[in-house]
């Protein structure tokens, strides 16, 4: 059985958060010669219904509220990928440069 799905945008990165400066080394390696304002992945929801996303090339962690409001939750010198909230409440991420890290602050 085949299902036809239609993808529609659920959220859109606000213009203020689009990186317009020099591409990171990761962006240059992944998309040589092309602009890259973000590369969002690692989406998951916390217990309060917030959506968390990592922006790999620019070391940013975004939180999107259930109402669709974006905030920059963390900015690190790294390339964060997968993230989760640990059972004890700590925010844990896998980072290409630093390995397994805890996001604090």
Question: What function would you assign to each model-found segment?
Answer:
Residues 1-105:
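Sequence-structural signature of mature extracellular/luminal beta-sheet repeat domains
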């Amino acid at each position: 059985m085949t299902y036809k799905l239609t993808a529609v945008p659920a959220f859109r990165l606000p213009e203020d958060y689009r990186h317009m400066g020099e591409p990171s080394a990761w962006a240059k390696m992944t998309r040589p010669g092309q602009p890259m304002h973000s590369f969002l992945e690692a989406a998951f929801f916390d217990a309060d219904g917030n959506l968390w996303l990592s922006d790999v090339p620019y070391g940013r962690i975004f939180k999107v509220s259930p109402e669709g409001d974006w905030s920059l939750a963390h900015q690190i010198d790294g390339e964060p990928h997968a993230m989760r909230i640990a059972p004890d409440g700590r925010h844990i991420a896998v980072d290409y440069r630093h390995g397994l890290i805890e996001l604090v602050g």
